[in-house]
Amino acid sequence: MSLQSKVNIFCPPLPVNSEDNCFWRKPTGCARNLAISNAASYADGPILLICKDNESVEQSIQELKYFSLNKNFRVFSLPDWETLPYDIFSPHQDIISERLSALYHLPELDRGVLVISITSLMHWLPPLKYISANSLELKIGQKLSISQIREQMILAGYRTVESVLEHGEFAVRGSIIDIYPMGSRLPFRVDLFDDRIDSLRMFDPETQRSLEQVNEIKLLPGREYPLDDMGIANFRNAFHELFDIDFRRCPLYQDVSAGIDTPGLEYYLGIFFDNLSSLFDFLPSTTIICHEGDLHKAGEQFWESITSLYEDRRVDRYRPILDPDTVFIRIDQIMSNFENYREIEIKDHTEAFDLETMALPDLTSKMQLKKPFTSLQKLISKNHERILFCAETAGRKETLLETLKHIGIKPTTVPHWEDFLERDDPLSITIAPLEQGLWLPTKDILLVSENQLYGNRVAQRRRRRKSQSNTDQILTNLTELRINDAVVHVDHGVGRYRGLQTITTEGQAIEFLTVEYANTAKLYVPVASLHLISRYSGTDQENVPLNHLGTTQWLKTKRKAAEKIHDVAAELLEIYARRQTKKGFKCKIDIEQYDKFSSSFPFEETADQQNTCLLYTSDAADE
């Protein structure tokens, strides 16, 4: 077979057995994920897509979900913990929830796509039967004791709260039990009549309003390790065998012995169980592994960062750590498992299939010119392909529609990809999170993303975290920080900035902010996560009380603040409601001129600036 063997991207070839790999020539733009989505719809097993890093995982999931909408399979991931190896704090509850859900459903999966990074694949996992053996099931009509379910929930790793807001929480109010199960999209409200379940309803955690009723719910464990009697005994026995320290002076050992779920226990997973599993133990035998790029190199770089951090932190006698092989899996061992599965390699191989895709020409608008979209207009006039414009959000779609309208282009709105394929409109527009489009010459189809029309401005917007703070306390530049300044981390509370430290992870030297908390505990925050840090706004900077890492102190403080904010928000809503009843002067905004004006701004706007501009233009265009 030659390099130029061409195949239909809507029906790409799949490997027949584990002995003969299938090669796809590296496609352009979003074509890889389109091909995987199409292949997953008729494959006789799930597809495991292995990406080189977490950013690739996120983009792949978004594109796969778009192309797979209305198809008979699901797209999900086993997300990375998003912590450094041997970190002293735990992953976010939403990450743990997503991981537990993936591991629970994976063994019985007959069709779908699981996306994972090579670094996440190199972590040991709890035993295969752990999640199912520690799950609970609640059904309407089932007999239930409140005291018993409370005890079971706490043992499973759920936290008692007053109002359920995030995964792994539950609240008891009389005969009503609110639970936010791990792996669930929404929390549930369990209503008891005497000692039996009378109703089970989903509810909105923000409004606390009940939604649709269900007949049963599944409660997965709240963490990836057990803190029952057996789990604690295993931990204590292994700790005594591995470490020659004074256990009375080891807070980690004391916490686990008392059944306290202390942060960072994920990196001690190996001593809670007699045996661990890898992801391959969870995969069905019919799984097809798909990967691109040099995974071995990426895995070696990650292992180097693991061993480097291990050497740095192994000297801490008050928090001894496990050796790398107990926590992580070497890349050679990972890749040796590939031979047990069918495999798709995306590379320019002599026997690679060509998916027949082409890169789009440069369509970037030149807003400084009188006719900024000349390249796009030429493409439309010279070609007869059907074009699908892709905007990120409904608001961006309306803006793009106005822009295209000014140059005589009037696309038809389509709800999704399958709908576009079924229609024959020459120009269409949809909401799709595509980084890059593609050209399918054999199908006479072009996908044009916002990014390809506006350049990096859209990509930069996408990469900003949704949780970015909009207060004037946000730190936008490291020069604003001085050593020993009091700072606030959104998840861990008040600490002191102790400077920058360079740590090598995944083969890259990355700078971290060092924040010191009570009892000299240190937290390392990547510079890329600077938006999580803000200045302490209190008056007494010298005597500010520092929070303790790994306690609920900061969580309680945030909850009290949230309650006060809720009261203030109610007052503001009343004010805004009164303002809405009054009409003002409506301005008509020339979108083309406004975009031209905006593109002349020589700097990248801050989140505050963008938000202010958006509010102003929206208000001006409304009555």
Language-model-detected regions and their locations in the chain:
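A short, hydrophobic C-terminal helix/tail in secreted or cell-surface proteins
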Residues: D619-E623
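Conserved beta-alpha structural segments and adjacent helices that either
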Residues: M1-E542, A561-K586, Q593-Y594, P602-F603, ...
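Major-groove DNA-contacting interfaces characterized by cationic-aromatic clusters
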Residues: N543-G550, W554
